Amino acid sequence: EAFGYDTPNTTFIEGELEKLDELDLEAGSFDLIISNCVINLCSDKPAVFRAAHRLLKPGGELYFSDVYADRRIPAELVKDPVLYGECLSGALYWGDYQAVAMAAGFGDPRVVDHRPLAILDPELKAKVGQIRFASVTARLFKLEGLEPACEDYGQAVIYRGGVEGMEDVFILDAEHAIEQGRVFPVCGNTLAMLMETRFAAHFDVVGAGDRHFGLFPGCAAPDVFAAVDTASTSAAPV
């Protein structure tokens, strides 16, 4: 009623992220799954990614934010209830996250946004020592045929516009801001993320893609633990 609907358009289902298979959810029926900083609290993180992949339609997406560490967290810190409750000691090592995501079937994980977490509390800082943490918003697509590296097939896209909130510039990830009406060269993986998903109606493709030109230049993922430009963003305190 508050949003002007005559009948409810939302269904709430109680369950556990690690046990989505126990819920009455149809495999391959979801266009989009969203999660906000809760996967790090799950004890069986690979199960979460496997279940999400199973539930998504081909071309579907897991869009989520979470906290990651620049190394594997020692077992004694994982057991610390304060650190765990602060979403720190349950954080996946960044390299393990990428391996877990790809093992679940999500090729070429993308970073949408990231910022380092500044540990300001003296007691927490003493416990974590030199471990660095980052808050990352990521997107994972359920797509067949994504390659291990970004490959150049001489193709580009033109953004037509029309995505709500991104009328002038479409942000796929931290490395791809696509201006409306401009020819934008893309690698094969990025092309698939645009043309084999719900975004396809908003793009035109330039090039047949029948010739390989080697690695696509400048398509490396960002260092999520690197210092950020303080003029434009800031680290989140803990």
Question: What do the PLM-derived regions correspond to, one by one?
Answer:
Residues 18, 31-44:
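A short SAM/SAH-binding and catalytic strip from SAM-dependent methyltransferases
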Residues 1-9:
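Short, conserved SAM-binding/catalytic segment
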Residues 104-238:
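C-terminal lobe and adjacent flexible extensions of AdoMet/dcAdoMet transferase-like proteins
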